């Protein structure tokens, strides 16, 4: 009996070890802000560098410091000019600067009464349409996802929520309070995170909730090993990036990357 059990466990372990990560050897585009920006070097690797090493993938990184949702299509245009559609997936990691800038949350939809054929009878029904408005947070997200899903209908698109925010000072006129404070339009960071979760459902794009799952909580000094410290408790350091990358790596195990594959390995 013990031999049979040992054999079963061995077979299970061999099966698990034989499963290849679905994102292995992939070509991944990264849009985002300073945490993604390849021009802002951390004392080590960025999260996408870790993922590139672990997955043997090719990263195409277009994130720029300070960017908000309304600037993502500009990053997409640069990508298109450089690599066209020669990639497998897009990750979008942005939103924290929209919160810091006090961008209003806004609405997802507008509604209007229209006449429509229902079972052969013309009736009046209320119809909703996405708000496409760069002056609001949800409007910005709608614009980006509407465009990307139309332009790249066969590509995987993954949203990453912003992580928690602690105090940062990058100059006398660039002081950013921690997330326990409302922003200029009276919203907490939570509202911006929740909107990205909602966008996942509205636009049928998966979301990796780093705000909840990464474990990073720089408001506690005990987690100082994950941030540069001093005047910057906002950006993760190399160890913070590694922890984010670990979370993303394991979440990606549940998501397909190449959507043109006919049968999983």
Where are these predicted regions, by residue range?
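Residue-level detector of intrinsically disordered/flexible regions characterized by low predicted structural confidence
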Residues: 4, 264-265
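A periodicity- and composition-biased signal for non-globular, repetitive helical segments
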Residues: 8-9, 146
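Alpha-helical cap/lid subdomain in secreted, periplasmic
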Residues: 54, 75-264
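Sec-dependent signal peptide recognition
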Residues: 2-8
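Serine-esterase "nucleophile elbow" of acetyl-processing enzymes
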Residues: 17-65, 70, 76-86, 90, ...
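Hydrophobic h-region of N-terminal signal peptides that target proteins for export
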Residues: 9-17
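Alpha-helical transmembrane segments and their juxtamembrane interfaces
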Residues: 12-13, 43, 166, 247
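Residues that line or immediately flank small-molecule/substrate-binding pockets and catalytic motifs
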Residues: 8, 32, 94
């Amino acid at each position: 009996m013990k031999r049979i059990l040992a054999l079963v466990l061995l077979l299970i372990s061999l099966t698990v070890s034989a499963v290849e990560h679905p994102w292995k050897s992939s070509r991944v585009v990264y849009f985002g802000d300073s945490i993604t920006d390849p021009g802002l070097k951390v004392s080590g690797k960025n999260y996408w560098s870790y993922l590139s090493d672990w997955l043997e993938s090719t990263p195409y990184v277009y994130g720029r410091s300070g960017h908000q949702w309304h600037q993502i299509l500009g990053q997409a245009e640069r990508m298109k000019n450089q690599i066209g559609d020669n990639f497998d997936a897009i990750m979008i990691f942005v939103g924290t600067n929209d919160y810091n800038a006090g961008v209003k949350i806004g609405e997802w939809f507008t509604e209007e009464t229209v006449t429509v054929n229902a079972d052969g009878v013309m009736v009046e029904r209320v119809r909703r349409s996405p708000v496409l408005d760069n002056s609001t947070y949800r409007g910005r997200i709608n614009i980006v996802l509407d465009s990307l899903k139309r332009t790249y209908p066969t590509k995987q698109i993954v949203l990453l929520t912003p992580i928690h925010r602690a105090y940062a000072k990058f100059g006398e006129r660039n002081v950013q309070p921690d997330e326990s404070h409302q922003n200029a339009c009276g919203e907490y960071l939570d509202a911006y995170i929740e909107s990205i979760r909602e966008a996942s459902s509205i636009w049928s794009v998966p979301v990796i909730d780093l705000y909840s799952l990464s474990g990073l909580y720089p408001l506690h000094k005990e987690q100082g090993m994950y941030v540069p410290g001093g005047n910057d408790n906002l950006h993760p350091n190399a160890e913070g990036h590694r922890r984010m990358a670990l979370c993303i790596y394991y979440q990606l195990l549940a998501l397909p990357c190449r959507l043109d594959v006919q049968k999983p390995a």
